[in-house]
Amino acid sequence: MEKNIPQHIAIIMDGNGRWAKKRGLARSFGHMEGAKSLRRALEYFTEIGVKYLTVYAFSTENWSRSQDEVSTLMKLFLKYIKSERKNMMKNKIRFFVSGRKNNIPEKLLNEIEKLKEETKNNDKITLNIAFNYGSRAEIIDAVNDIIKDGKENITEEDFSKYLYNDFPDPDLLIRTSGEMRISNFLLWQIAYSELYITDTLWPDFDEKEIDKAIESYNQRDRRFGGVKNV
């Protein structure tokens, strides 16, 4: 049977710290391995025909972590952007970031905007990185913008236009590390997304694990609130 490949996959990339701890390493090593895992996953998703990949990289709640860890994550993201620029252009990957801009170092913000502009016409796959992102924050920001615009009688379609991007809703949400929660991620957008939870830690999430997730997705009966015809 031919596989039905999700158009949009979202991932809560969890478990970097636990991966490092199991090996007696600092959490920063786990984050570095997590970046390698993202590179590998993006390449495979591109190969199999996924059109949008949204990954949860840094939440609005992550500012409560130690200053050293937050600084490491900022530097790692900056390094990722610089190192992946050539690859994104070569493989026609569109780069996008969803989240608030406040508190992000200016140098990092500039590199984000630069890469977004450089890749805006790439059409193979869109990599959407949720950075300084929280879904409640996104919803509040949307509501405030609607109020500023003086809009009334808002529909779901109208509201969606005020979110951080206009990408289609995720078909499949994957969470690694076995945690059974959404963690303030894409609350509006995942209303009818299929959920897949794996105990595999993010640095170990490879092509075989992706295949398992898609196989599980293919076994689902997506009714979107309706009733299947008999």
Residue ranges and their predicted role:
Residues 1-230:
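Flexible, compositionally biased loop and terminal segments
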